[in-house]
Amino acid sequence: MKQSKKQGILERFYYSSDEIIEKPFNWAQMWRLLSYVKPYRKTILPLSFLTVLIGTAVKLVIPILIGVYVLDQAITARNSELLIQLILIISGLYILNYAANVLRIRWMNQLGQHVIYDLRQHLFTHVQRLSHRFFDQRSAGSILVRIMNDINSLQELFTSGVINLLTDLLLLAGVIIILFTLSPELTIAIMVTLPIMFFISTSLRKKIRRSWQTVRLKQSKLNSHLNESIQGIRVTQAFTQEEENMAYFDGVNQENYQSWREATRKNAMFRPLVEMTNAIGTAVLIWYGATLIMNETITIGVFVSFAFYLGMFWEPISRLGQVYNQLLMGMASSERIFEFLDEQPNVKEKPDAIHKKKINGEISFEEVEFSYDEKRKALHAVSFSIPAGSTLALVGHTGSGKTTIANLISRFYDATGGTIKIDGVPIQNLSLASLRSQISIVLQDTFIFSGSIMENILFGRPDASEEEVMKAAQAVGADEFISGLAEGYQTEVEERGSVLSAGQRQLISFARALLADPAIIILDEATASIDTETEVKIQRALKTLLKGRTAVMIAHRLSTIRDADRIIVLDHGKKMEEGKHEQLLAKGGIYAGLVKAQYSTG
């Protein structure tokens, strides 16, 4: 029974957007990733490549100097002068190689940091421009994973992975050329095991790739739950669901652990394969090389050089397992990053969109329909008009379509049918910036950012002066409680304003909206979470706030909309009634029933 309950907990969430992305490795994607290096192709990048070339050249020269020149010429001829010269040259080359490696690491780290900064900035900027539907389909945790974890996993790829791959490929090419130059038959003999290793490693490739994709998926799920648990800790504790929450965390943490374990297990199979092949190659070198020496086909110096080069040959191949691991992790992360970057806003701005510096605020809905998905229709042919400067109240049960109308006015979504106009202009013809900059929205659960109260109010208009901020706060009655704080307007508040009461947070949001000086104000259940005393203050402030502005009020407390110019009653996305407060009461319909029910329970 306990197991089945835990299994049910583990199935609590499912994020369809975080499924494993199954795409074969392709160079087009790799080139797209490397395109972020282009801004540095004339500075850090060529310097890094230069150090790679110098380091590789030094490594390739030293075995020849030791084997062919030191052993076969200096020592065999007992030429001490030549030996000293060669020792000095080899020592100098080692110093040069050290300097090249230091500079390579330094410049590649700089390049990697630049690329990661640019990529994260690009992704965050792109996500900021995506439509609300994108965020409806994804958890905050899964988005955070891609912006932070997935991009971080690319850091090692750029700082060492790509350059190591280039270095190893150059080294392998150089070693193979030199080996064939020294002795083609010995080279062929020691490489007989390569096809076997290539066949086995190719079969492992897809499995290793998929395992790292699974790791990314499980990390996303784990981070999503952590983010949700922290945000909802009060609800968890209020309902004493700590044990259930910990059980779920144990499940996703176990899944994450198992995915890492499986990925490292499969990846660990590669290095022993290389070492086994290296051992076979070394055995062939000793046996066949000794035969060639005894036949005087090659010298001892060439044999020693071969031994050096054989180590240099298998060393990068062995490292290729680690580099390939970095590459696979990078590709898995880049697929997820590019999936976000390829997302297009559902709400698109026309190239010739009109940028109106000032709108009057007249709003009209003409047979407007909207669906959040194919199964759920939120609005059914809704029509109404709001003259500029007037107040419209929307009333109805939860799910009746009130918030949907507010979202459509702000163009967070596009209507699936009908036309919405602002000042007689179809809303799609207006630029998003000019439209949204002249609309202020105050929500029931207002968001307070980490920072000072001054900064939170300034969010409505960042270029406003401190005096203007204080005037806005005074107008909505927020100045009274702000001035009573130890630091006043410079008081630091935590994320979501947890140190403030619901009423205080709402007053700050009103001040923020007033400071923005919008033509249209949308109040979405804005007075639902405040006490009666605070509501009286806000009702006074609203008269100042709404004066000369178009207002759309989504009402929970029907007492707050008595003075609205017009009230529309919605039910399951349909407009059922329309009129003033007194008219609708006299009609004795849905609105009258809602008022009666609220007063009888209040």
Features from the language model and the residues they span:
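Helix-loop-helix
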Residues: 79-81, 85-88, 178-192, 262, ...
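Transmembrane helix-loop-helix hairpins at lipid-water interfaces of multipass membrane proteins
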Residues: 45-100, 107, 180-185, 283, ...
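An intracellular "coupling" helix at the cytosolic face of ABC transporter transmembrane type-1 domains
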Residues: 34, 39-42, 132-133, 149-158, ...
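Juxtamembrane loop-to-helix connectors within ABC transporter transmembrane domains
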Residues: 29, 37, 104, 108-112, ...
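ABC-type nucleotide-binding domain
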Residues: 349, 356-602
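Membrane-integrated ABC transporters
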Residues: 1-58, 74-86, 104-108, 112, ...
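Transmembrane helices of ABC transporter permease
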Residues: 43-54, 93, 163-214, 286-298, ...
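Hydrophobic alpha-helical transmembrane segments of ABC transporter permease domains
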Residues: 46, 58-62, 88, 100, ...
